[in-house]
Amino acid sequence: ITDHDRNRCEDDFLNDNLIDFSLMRLSKEKYLIEEKDLYIFSSFFYKRYIQGKSNYRSNKHYDNTIKSREDLAYSYVEKWTKNIDIFQCKYLLIPVNKDIHWSLLIVCNPDKINVPKGTAEDDDDYFCIYHLDSLGCHNTKALTMNIYTYLKKAWKVMKKKKDADKKKEGDTNNNDEKKEGFARLKYDKVKGIPKQANSTDCGVFVTLYAEHFLKYLLASGKNIGTVTRRMFIEKQYDKIFGMKFRERGNNFYPWFNSSRSTKERFALKILIDDKEELYN
């Protein structure tokens, strides 16, 4: 964290350093989420993945091993999660920076991506992606499709490695092998969430969305809950995000007050000063 980063806490657009710092603090210091429950991707992840897709045409002319745009994109970020099995996590948080705007993707039950479409029951853990956007200007379908494509490739790579390891150990039993198939992409652009009132608070709202989501995850105790097919279809934001249901009007009370953004900026600046020796 530099002085330039710190100065952005006043009223400027939060950059990648500040987003990563804020999200890391939430998961590692404030709420102490275990790795088996949550993985937070770097703020560079999505941008780097898209760079790989964009470079496909120029790369395929001199590298005939590149089979597809998606394979090249995956190769750009493959090593970023080499030390963690993201499919053991219940949730993945992915901050997205696109067109000078931040939004947040929350992937639920990534391990259920291999459940063939049409086979999930209402109360089963369900693979889905939520999109929280404080301006509503990001294309939810495009963003979630890119992450869906990444996860499918990551699953195939992971399974291939596990099969190879079993073969090395002399285990040739394929009885536990599931029929190849993937769940459909199911996404939801969450409505009714607090929105920014200016052009610079999008990063602050990403941290606020993440904080309130993590806070609710831990509210139920040590056993962090999950999202079922029924919860997704019925948009049970009270059970997923902890939003309070408003019986009159059939909607939800505000998740938090939008004015929190000003306090959040001040708190972030103070935190950077307090942690200067540790994070500089």
Describe these PLM feature segments.
Residues 21-24, 28, 42, 94-98, ...:
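Ordered, helix-dominated protein-protein interaction surfaces in large eukaryotic regulatory proteins
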Residues 4-5, 17-21, 76-79, 146, ...:
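Exposed alpha-helical structural elements
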Residues 144, 152-280:
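C-terminal folded domains that constitute the principal catalytic or ligand-binding module
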Residues 1-103, 107-129, 137-140, 166-167, ...:
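Cysteine protease catalytic domains with a Cys-His-Asp triad
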